[in-house]
Amino acid sequence: MKLNEKQLQQVDAQVKRLLKSGSFYGEVYRKAGISGVSSQEDFEKLPFSSKDDLRNAYPLGIQAVPEEEVVRIHSSSGTTGKPVIIPYTAKDVDDWAIMFARCYETAGITNKDRIQITPAYGLWTAGIGFQLGA
């Protein structure tokens, strides 16, 4: 994926914020020798996270904002191991709704259609996105 200059600046700002916060991802980047992202080459050096990385951060080790900014907490089911707990800010929830709305639009769904959300999602991470995007 080729990033434009604005995207590189946005990624750089996020990486620097995470490094400053000492969060889970800040530590991942620090250990990988990442100090910022100013080029496509820098972007391509960003490490991936595995499911085990996220499980090892249980319960709220991936939280990168102050507690008072967390408005929802969702979880994976934990059926294949320790659940992954994901805290969301209000902006995260809004962005998630927009992303799902775009998915519905791409699928050809309009305001004349009805959507049935069948999973018993409870705290399932994607459940609220399905609901809010509708």
Spans of features found by a protein language model:
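Nucleotide 5′-phosphate-binding alpha/beta core
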Residues: M1-S75, T80-I98, R102-T106, T110-K112
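Conserved AMP-binding loop of ANL adenylate-forming enzymes
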Residues: E105-A134
